[in-house]
């Protein structure tokens, strides 16, 4: 009996560009295969927990296969830390299941509400890219359902082209059913954190550059509305996993305790315009002033350090019904002026982004459409109705392209297809791979049609 589908209005986490699709929630790989077979003439895309900010997991008028019912952990090797699980397993589920045994996910983005399949398809990165690379570097294999109905076990050694086309390939080579990941051994579930408050963008970049060798995890929250001599002032947090000896005596009895929970929930409806230049300037001032000028050795929980926004359920609602656009770029080292000029334009136009994050990326990842490259990455959240937003983002596009940089496909919701080739030099390789493994174009999304992927 075919798996039922039902019409559902979908958006990305940014809540822009809603479309209707026929959504199914298969319980196992056989049901996924049946859905793909039945949808050959309509088109299909996989969807996890819906944390892509854009329409990467939307498929207007077509079929969306939601994998969140497929969340079994299939095996674990306590010697190597390799875990095999279904694609719908979330990073939070892995943390909850394996932190008590001393294992953590190798790479975590800013939310733990991401499925393993989605983490591979977006090749997500975290605060440790300079030391650990992106998520797919820690994947040893995955089972991929391709358009011909076959299930292939793909490894970087057996099928490198398909592996690195799928990692960062936004779900367009097939549906990931299962994956094997190498977890990271940790002694505690706490982070030993150092904090520095910087005065301007020069000090911020200098401190970030000096931090790479000493910390596994580093990030800067940046005040995007600061001007003049305070342009780019930031609060930098850097950390490594704590040892048992680093903990307070009372916490040493349960060094691997982990109890994730959202503290509060955002109301179903927030008024439009609550996030604006005036409120963000006030929030930025408070956030900056409350940070210590310098503090070392603070013990933080995983939730506080890695996923502060997960403490608010549906935090995306605070931007109002119009939603928000996240804009994230990376430019090569040597293009520091692009970051400076970006902040100058943002502050001049008073474009409000409270969640403004600056990081350094390490060695580039092998994925054909993987986002990271060695350089500076800046991420910004703007209310969708921000005045002059289209003009501002077009100006930032020019700066990024001129420096040989790129935008993140898991977040972009607006660039035209002609910008893809200069940003992603292996786009032609990806298109050839898609033509080979999916000649009829069974897999597709609103994102892939916009960008001609």
PLM segments and residue spans:
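Noncatalytic alpha-helical scaffold of FAD-dependent oxidoreductases
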Residues: 1-453
